[in-house]
């Protein structure tokens, strides 16, 4: 018997991811749908990956590629901490991702958002594109769902948001992306990072913000 066509497709994080600076830290958010072609392989994937104690990344693109890169960077940061007896900066982690993505740009499909808190810069967000460029931004969005929400994010973002304002901004942005993008869906996962540590939240699909649906 011939195998289904979707078995020949790579597992893909066709996705909606974002990270936003607020007054005191950063908030990262992602949907949870993983696709293999048109087939939904996983409805509850965790696309927010810990890299160090207060540094996380959001992954989009090939699931295998982004997981492998994350493992490499986590290892290098552990070595960094052991050798220097000091916590790494968010920029250090982002630079490692950028180096790996750029050096292997012809072989990888990986879009990464790195965010976290360190004692030098506080909360910061870095966007590493598919080609390996790195840009520091007050907020970053990525994945297939991001194409639907650029205008919304540009109009609603404001510097120095409070924690609650930032959570609402991230939830609404991702809910809009998930509604429009067929490769995004499931639940919204949030990761709130500040000087006190990391807080994880999950918003089930039936509790997502509702907008006009026609």
From Swiss-Prot:
Query: SUPFAM superfamilies from the entry?
Result: N-terminal nucleophile aminohydrolases (Ntn hydrolases)
One molecular function GO term is: endopeptidase activity
Query: What does UniProt list as catalytic?
Result: 15
GO annotation, biological process? proteasomal protein catabolic process; proteasome-mediated ubiquitin-dependent protein catabolic process
EC numbers: 3.4.25.1
Keywords, ordered alphabetically:
Cytoplasm, Hydrolase, Nucleus, Protease, Proteasome, Threonine protease, Zymogen
Subunit record text: The 26S proteasome consists of a 20S proteasome core and two 19S regulatory subunits. The 20S proteasome core is composed of 28 subunits that are arranged in four stacked rings, resulting in a barrel-shaped structure. The two end rings are each formed by seven alpha subunits, and the two central rings are each formed by seven beta subunits. The catalytic chamber with the active sites is on the inside of the barrel.
Q: Any idea what this protein is called?
A: Proteasome subunit beta type-6
């Amino acid at each position: 018997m011939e195998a289904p066509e979707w078995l020949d497709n790579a597992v893909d994080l066709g996705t909606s991811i974002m990270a936003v600076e607020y007054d005191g830290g950063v908030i990262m958010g992602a949907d949870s749908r993983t696709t293999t072609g048109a087939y939904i392989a996983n409805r509850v994937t965790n696309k927010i990956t810990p890299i160090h104690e207060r540094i996380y990344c959001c992954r989009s693109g090939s699931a295998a590629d982004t997981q492998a890169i994350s493992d490499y960077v986590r290892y290098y940061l552990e070595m960094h901490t052991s050798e220097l007896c000091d916590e790494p900066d968010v920029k250090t982690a982002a630079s490692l991702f950028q180096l790996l993505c750029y050096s292997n740009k012809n072989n990888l499909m990986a879009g990464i958002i790195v965010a976290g808190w360190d004692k030098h810069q506080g909360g910061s967000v870095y966007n590493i594109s598919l080609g390996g460029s790195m840009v520091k931004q007050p907020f970053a969005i990525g994945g297939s769902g991001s194409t639907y929400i650029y205008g919304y994010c540009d109009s609603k973002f404001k510097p120095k948001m409070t924690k609650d304002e930032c959570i609402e901004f991230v939830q609404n942005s991702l809910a809009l992306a998930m509604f429009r993008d067929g490769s995004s869906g499931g639940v919204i996962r949030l990761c709130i990072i500040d000087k006190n540590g990391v807080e994880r939240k999950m918003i089930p699909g039936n509790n997502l913000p509702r907008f006009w649906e026609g």
